[in-house]
Curated annotation (Swiss-Prot):
Protein's recorded name: Cytidine deaminase
Cofactor note: Binds 1 zinc ion.
UniProt catalytic activity: cytidine + H2O + H(+) = uridine + NH4(+); 2'-deoxycytidine + H2O + H(+) = 2'-deoxyuridine + NH4(+)
Keywords: Hydrolase, Metal-binding, Zinc
List of residues binding Zn(2+): 102, 129, 132
Organism lineage string: Bacteria, Pseudomonadati, Pseudomonadota, Gammaproteobacteria, Vibrionales
Cofactor(s) demanded: Zn(2+)
Gene Ontology MF terms in the entry: cytidine deaminase activity; identical protein binding; zinc ion binding
A GO BP entry: cytidine deamination
EC supergroup of this enzyme: hydrolase
Species this protein is from: Photobacterium profundum (strain SS9)
Chain ranges of the CMP/dCMP-type deaminase domain: 48-168, 187-295
InterPro entries named among the record's database cross-references: APOBEC/CMP_deaminase_Zn-bd, CMP_dCMP_dom, Cyd/dCyd_deaminase_Zn-bd, Cyt/Deoxycyt_deaminase, Cyt_deam_dimer, Cytidine_deaminase-like, Cytidine_deaminase_bacteria
Length: 295
């Protein structure tokens, strides 16, 4: 079990800690809770749905990588499938602050990479910043998304972001987490690069058409993917590398275990992720080889 999760267990109510420990000790635990597991925890602890989600936030925050701020934030989103996904903020020493991943972005992209097509609610340690409110406004469920904070009544995202600006204002009907396949192909025969291309085909980039995906290979051969999550307000967009880093972190891997990376993006786009991807990987480890393909 992740050492930080063990530490976080000590901050939970004793009955909850006892109930969740076997789940976290399971070798197949992937930083998610199935609907059945969550229902069992509700029955065992006699907590309400929102109380249980808030009580589990220290576990989500245990995944935080915050060497700069030392401000550890956790988030839990529930997909339309009923499964709960943990997420946490991530910061990178030596990279610009624009490369930072917020906890809300982490949990949402975690759910996205595992196949969810909608989010019903999100539970967070602290009130979501404007950046994250805008990021969430890109979701397929932005109009109905519920936000839960500790010791607060739940509110909708639209209450946190009144008179919001979103995809519809730019005449865009696609939304983040929507099912899509851009049909990009590459001449490369390398399987690792092909995995990055597959991720690019599921990316959300209706504004620039920069369909892009990243694959990261760990030292043990495990591969993690990320796909670009673009935003109507541009700046809150989440690059494909960041989504892959979330995927890797939530699987319990340290970022020092990255052995290889690949970036595939649309060749005729008005933007490129190459420079930022190179710079951030360089900050993590200058020896990580990066394969780049413009399709």
């Amino acid at each position: 079990m992740h050492a930080k999760i063990m530490d976080a267990l000590g901050s939970l109510p004793s009955d909850l800690a006892s109930a969740v420990k076997p789940i976290f000790e399971d070798a197949n635990f992937d930083a998610t809770l199935s609907p059945e597991q969550f229902t069992t925890l509700l029955s065992t602890t006699h907590m309400t749905d929102s109380e249980l989600r808030v009580a589990l936030l220290p576990i989500a925050a245990a995944y935080s990588v915050a060497p700069i701020s030392k401000f550890f934030v956790g988030a839990i989103v529930r997909g339309e499938s009923g499964r709960l996904y943990f997420g946490a903020n991530m910061e990178f020493v030596g990279a610009s602050l624009s490369q930072t991943i917020h906890a809300e972005q982490s949990a949402i992209s975690h759910a996205w990479i595992k196949g969810e097509t909608g989010i019903t609610d999100i539970t967070i340690n602290y009130s979501p910043c404007g950046h994250c409110r805008q990021f969430m406004n890109e979701l397929t469920t932005a109009k109905t998304l519920i936000v839960q904070l500790p010791e607060r009544e739940e509110q909708t995202l639209q209450q946190y972001l009144p008179e919001s600006f979103g995809p519809a204002d730019l005449n865009i009907t696609d939304a983040l987490l929507g099912k899509i396949d851009h049909g990009m192909t590459i001449k490369e025969t390398d399987e690792f690069v092909a995995i990055a291309c597959k991720a690019a085909n599921g990316s959300h980039a209706p504004y620039t058409k920069n369909y892009s995906g990243v694959a990261l290979k760990a030292t043990d051969g495990k591969v993690f993917t990320g796909k670009y999550a673009e935003n109507a307000a541009f700046n809150p967009s989440l690059p494909p590398l960041q989504v892959a880093l979330v995927n890797m972190n939530m699987a319990g891997y340290a970022l020092t275990e990255i052995a290889e990376a690949a970036l595939v993006e649309k060749a005729d786009s008005t933007i490129s992720h190459l420079s930022d991807t190179q710079t951030t990987l360089e900050a993590l480890n200058p020896d990580i080889p990066l394969t780049y393909v413009a399709a």
